[in-house]
C-alpha cells in the first residue's frame, strides 16, 4: 500500500500554486499602477515557474455534432435482439449537412464482411426515419449514411429513428458472445464527429479503436427474456438484475452493455463509489485479489489525477482488455487457457486508467491513439512505482528499431508494430521528458493539472504538447524530436 497522503499533498500543492499565481498577478497590477504614477520604480521579478504567472487557456477540438440517444433493447430466448434507436442529432458545425454519417459496427461481423467467422452476426435494418419520414440510406461495412430531405443548418437538429434486429457473433471483436454471455459493444448507430468540413469517419480495423464519438446522454430501456446479470455504462444497474428496467448515462462517449449468466460477484464500496468484480471462472481468490488491486488503483488515480466520473466501477473478467465508460473488461481466459495473474492484473490497471484518459479526456483513437493508450500506460506505471516501491527507469534502447513517430494515424502503422508505438514508445519517451524535468512528483502533478484543464474536452497531439511545454516551461520542441510529429 502506498502513502495516500501524497495524493492530498499534490492537491494542496496545486491549490497553493494557483493561490500564489493569483497573488503574484495582483501584486503585478499594483506595481504597475504605482510605477505609472511615478511614485515607485519597480524591477521585473523573474520566476522559474513562468506558467504560474501567465494564464494558460486550453483549446479543445469541437465535435461538430451533438447527440442524445433514447433506445429500447429487447432480447428473446434465442439471443436475438430487437432495437428501436431514437437519436436527436444537432449540427454544431458551421456547415450545412446533406447527409448524416453513423458508425454501425454490428454490420462488420456479418457473413459478407467477416467470412472467417464460423458464427457471424445477423443484422437486419427494418426502417430508418428522419423527423418521422422514411429516408434513403446506404450501409457499407460499418458506415451508415442517411440522406436528408433538406439540408440541416448549423444549430438545427433532427430526430433519427432506426429500427433493426441483430444477433451477436461468436469470436467477434468486443461485439461478441460466447456459450453463456453476451457483450454489446458499439451495438447502436453512433453519430460520427464532423470536422474540417467533412464527416470524421474512418474504415473499421480489427486492431485499435476506429470509432470516435463525442460526449452524449443516453436513456436505455431494456427487456430480457432470460435470467441474466446486466452490467452497463449506467450507474443505475443493480445486482441481482431484473428482466427489465431503464438505464441512464450522462456525458459519456458510448454506452456498453454486458449480459452474464451466473457470474461470481465481488462488491465493495469505497466512499461513494461501488466497485464490482464479475468473474466467469472458478478462481474466486483471484477475483478478490483483483478487487483489492482495483481499490488501490482507484484511490491512487483519484488522488493523483482527479475524481472518478461515475458512481460504479465494473470490472468484467472475460473478453479482451478494453475500456468503456464505467466498465472495464480483461480476459481471464484466452483461447481456452487461463491468463496468468500478473498479466491479468496489469490489464485491469491499464483499463481503469482509461476511465480518465478516454472516459473524461477525449481524443480521436484513430488519429491520436497514443494520447489515451500512452497516457493510460504512463499513469499505470506511476501507480506501480508507488504500489510496488520501484524506481521508474528509461529504456530508449528498446525502441531503437522503431523510428516512426507515435502519433501517426492507425493506417500508417503495420498491424504488427502498431501497439509498440502507441502503447510502448509513447509512454517511454514521455517518461524521459519528466525524468529530465523533476521526475515522478512532477509527472503526478502534471496529470492532475492536465485533467483539470481538459476534462470533458477533446484534445489532439499539438494541444497536448502545447500544454506540456507550458507546464514544464520548455522553450522549444527538442524533447519531442524523433518521437512526435508536430504540425507547424
Predicted regions and their residues:
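Juxtacatalytic substrate-recognition/specificity segment
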Residues: 220, 246, 264-355, 359-364, ...
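Extended, low-hydrophobicity, Ser/Thr/Pro/Gly-biased non-transmembrane segments
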Residues: 126, 163-256
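A surface-exposed beta-strand-loop module
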Residues: 117-181
